[in-house]
């Protein structure tokens, strides 16, 4: 399956991008049309971008001449079945990891073999063994996968409820549902790294400290302005970030308000506007953008669906000082138009070899490229 890259849809998106507001000196353009585009992974040579979805496809966006514009978009490994293959990540050596709803696979040298229909796939976590099959859900099963400074895999496992019920907590703590798990890259030595997560769909390691930072989507139905969304900083293994005792930030959930939370709950580094849906994120490690952006976090707010006054649909930037204090502000906005309708919903962020930034949008079915061109 090939996706046409020109026509009315591309023209329409280019018109929308004229309304996106960013700091002076930045430009945004359409990089590729990619249906349902979610998490992204740039291959080490920079000639192919792999894009996950919440459907049944992984897409490959190729730029063979490396001119910064997509040449072709096709489905990856069409002979294989994928089930919510949201999470994609490359190792430095070119191994592609794909985290599905209940399966994790590795594809050696995917950058060089994606042209053919048949590719080598290695089970890292066999199908049905990432979570108990009885816990499979469409809700909160979009995984992200990362490789840590320790060379291990880190995989988010959202819990499927609005608020996790008490009778599930023991199972979830054992399996890492409502948390982040880590394992060796062959799938061995699995352990729970993070507890007390509701549904995280964005994570990255600080390029200097190696600490894991991650976003979390918080409880619905408590009101327009509570609880806040979260950007979290994890300083050691085993920390608990408060779900289900806390709905977001320090706001207690109705279901657990009479229950004493565990000791040592870690509260977020940044509380974000309620229901804006903070999803994918990445640290900026390139040299193209002005110096103040070095090692800052760029993150995508997907936009609300259950708020009287819609919010989100923008790219945020978070500056972190030497003590780990974080300050977040809007960087690119305008996908929520003046009629309060969504013209797009940014979902995830990744960086290109030249220091440009790519932003995926599963609502528009597009990937945008943001670069700094100077004043």
Language model features: what each stretch is:
Residues 45, 53-54, 101-103, 109, ...:
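Short loop/turn segments immediately following the C-termini of beta-strands
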Residues 30-35, 76-81, 124-137, 192-196, ...:
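Surface loop/turn motifs at the tips and blade-to-blade linkers of beta-strand repeat domains
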């Amino acid at each position: 399956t090939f996706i046409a890259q020109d026509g009315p849809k591309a023209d329409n998106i280019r018109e929308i991008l004229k309304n996106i507001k960013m700091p002076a000196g930045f430009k945004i353009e359409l990089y590729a049309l990619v249906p349902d585009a979610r998490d992204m992974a740039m291959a080490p040579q920079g000639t192919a971008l792999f894009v996950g979805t919440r459907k049944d496809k992984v897409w490959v966006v190729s730029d063979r001449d490396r001119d910064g514009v997509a040449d072709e978009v096709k489905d990856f490994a069409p002979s294989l079945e994928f089930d919510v293959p949201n999470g994609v990540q490359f190792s430095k050596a070119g191994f592609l990891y794909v985290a599905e709803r209940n399966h994790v696979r590795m594809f050696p040298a995917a950058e060089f073999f994606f042209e053919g229909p048949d590719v080598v796939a290695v089970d890292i976590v066999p199908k049905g063994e990432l979570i108990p099959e009885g816990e499979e859900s469409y809700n909160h099963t979009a995984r992200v996968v990362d490789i840590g400074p320790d060379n291990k895999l880190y995989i988010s496992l959202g819990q499927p409820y609005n608020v996790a019920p008490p009778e599930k907590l023991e199972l979830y703590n054992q399996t890492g549902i409502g948390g982040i798990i880590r394992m060796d890259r062959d799938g061995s030595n699995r352990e729970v790294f993070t507890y007390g997560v509701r549904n995280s769909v964005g994570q990255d390691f600080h390029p200097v400290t190696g600490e894991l930072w991650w976003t979390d989507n918080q409880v619905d139905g408590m009101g327009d302005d509570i609880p806040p969304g979260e950007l979290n900083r994890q300083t050691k293994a085993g920390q608990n970030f408060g779900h289900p005792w806390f709905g977001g930030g320090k706001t207690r959930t109705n279901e657990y308000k009479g229950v004493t939370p565990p000791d040592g709950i870690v509260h977020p580094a940044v509380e974000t506007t309620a229901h804006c849906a903070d999803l994918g994120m990445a640290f900026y490690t390139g040299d193209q953008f002005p110096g103040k952006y070095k090692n800052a976090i760029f993150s995508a707010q997907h936009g609300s669906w259950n708020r009287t006054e819609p919010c989100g649909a923008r790219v945020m930037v978070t500056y972190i000082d030497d003590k780990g204090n974080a300050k977040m502000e809007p960087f690119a906005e305008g996908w929520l138009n003046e009629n309060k309708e969504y013209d797009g919903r940014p979902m995830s962020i990744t960086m290109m070899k030249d220091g440009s930034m790519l932003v995926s949008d599963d609502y528009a079915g597009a990937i945008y490229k943001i670069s700094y061109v100077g004043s």
